[in-house]
């Protein structure tokens, strides 16, 4: 059977009529210059600031500069495969990261991609890395304590949920140790922790993750890692990505703690990007908006009002100083943004006082309202006595003949300094801190040798846990020292002192 030519023509016409080519309209541009993690692109006039762009080979970029005839874009990932003339597409989306409980226990990069080899993360939600901070009406003043487990901090520079407390000090003074101890102490407190490592050595980050795993802290922690080998754009977005992950829990009415370790390296990465994008340099060659870089990040930490769920996001930014210079550009910026600072000193660290907190210039501007009453009752005199001790110790170096009152004050001060020492990774619950500091400020340690103070503390706490557990239970539940409880605590200290043999 043969087909006639007109039948063939009719079949072809039918097929042509039915043919539908799916049209895909994409806004695309061309790379005109690339290098050092920066690309200049021509032809994307409608691009938005902060928009995600797609380069060939599944590499993404983020728009930072919008100029008359081209746009400046930072490349989030390996940029060696990108060349001039490549086509770049708009995605129409602002840079987002996966958020939600699926990330807990994982180590991810700033784009939310897993780095721990435990398989893909099937997050159901995404959040833009840049989002506006909650307004005044949505907030509530800080009033709940966030215990760090460190006696020196919880007594003298208390931190509340929703606060921003800066940890500042030279390199190797124990800044990360304070942050890691705080994470370990959140066990069982229903606080999700996000540790953001910016520009750290990969071995250091691996060490932190191992420590958290050993103490069971990875069950409620997300680690965002942008190591020193990553390109500057990833270091720049890492804190914002970590903050977005924390905000998910904040708006769900839960409590989150975000640690940025450290923001000095983020500022350096941002300076690098700004100079490459030909933005005018300012003081110390940082761009003019370096204050806004950190303020818009730290303002996202908040304690929400009950109408908005009552969630909280606490921020502990870390800043590294050079030779103890707190008055440099970035440290002063971040000090003015935060609600107080914990200043760690290398001199104290090397003299064996660890955590090496300088009580004189460490402050917490809002944490006092969050401190439990029992701690306020015992720690009120602690800061004053320590300050007097430091002043007298400086004078005592010049004269040997001191009157009895001065000598007694110096002796008390030495024991207070000793009692505030604490080993790493051994956070202490608040009721035990109250009992120990109570003994120190009320002079019960004055007749104990300085070398035996920590041994006394260990024995006394063991005695309280076994013989007088009801005292600790009452402090924990009532959160205040009544006259009756104070009398029983004094009695317990007296009873233990009789049995204590150094």
Swiss-Prot record:
Q: Where is this site: Required for activity?
A: 362
List of residues binding ATP: 169-176
Q: Which domain of life is it from?
A: Bacteria
Output the InterPro entries linked to this UniProt entry.
ATP_synth_asu-like_sf (IPR023366), ATP_synth_asu_C (IPR000793), ATP_synth_asu_C_sf (IPR038376), ATP_synth_F1_a_nt-bd_dom (IPR033732), ATP_synth_F1_asu (IPR005294), ATPase_a/bsu_AS (IPR020003), ATPase_F1/V1/A1_a/bsu_N (IPR004100), ATPase_F1/V1/A1_a/bsu_N_sf (IPR036121)
Q: Specify the protein's topology with respect to the membrane.
A: Peripheral membrane protein
Where does this protein reside within or beyond the cell?
Cell membrane
Catalysis: reaction(s): ATP + H2O + 4 H(+)(in) = ADP + phosphate + 5 H(+)(out)
The answer on whether this UniProt entry bears the keyword Nucleotide-binding reads: yes
Question: Gene3D superfamilies, per this entry?
Answer: 2.40.30.20, ATP synthase alpha/beta chain, C-terminal domain, P-loop containing nucleotide triphosphate hydrolases
Record keywords, A-Z: ATP synthesis, ATP-binding, Cell membrane, CF(1), Hydrogen ion transport, Ion transport, Membrane, Nucleotide-binding, Translocase, Transport
Q: Single GO cellular component annotation?
A: proton-transporting ATP synthase complex
Task: Decide whether keyword Methyltransferase is in the record.
Answer: no
Might you give the EC number(s) for this enzyme? 7.1.2.2
Question: In the record, what terms sit under GO molecular function?
Answer: ADP binding; ATP binding; proton-transporting ATP synthase activity, rotational mechanism
The main location is membrane
This protein's assembly is summarised as: F-type ATPases have 2 components, CF(1) - the catalytic core - and CF(0) - the membrane proton channel. CF(1) has five subunits: alpha(3), beta(3), gamma(1), delta(1), epsilon(1). CF(0) has four main subunits: a, b, b' and c.
The protein's role, per its UniProt record: Produces ATP from ADP in the presence of a proton gradient across the membrane. The alpha chain is a regulatory subunit.
Would you tell me the protein name for this molecule? ATP synthase subunit alpha
The taxonomy runs: Bacteria, Bacillati, Bacillota, Clostridia, Eubacteriales
* Gene designation: atpA
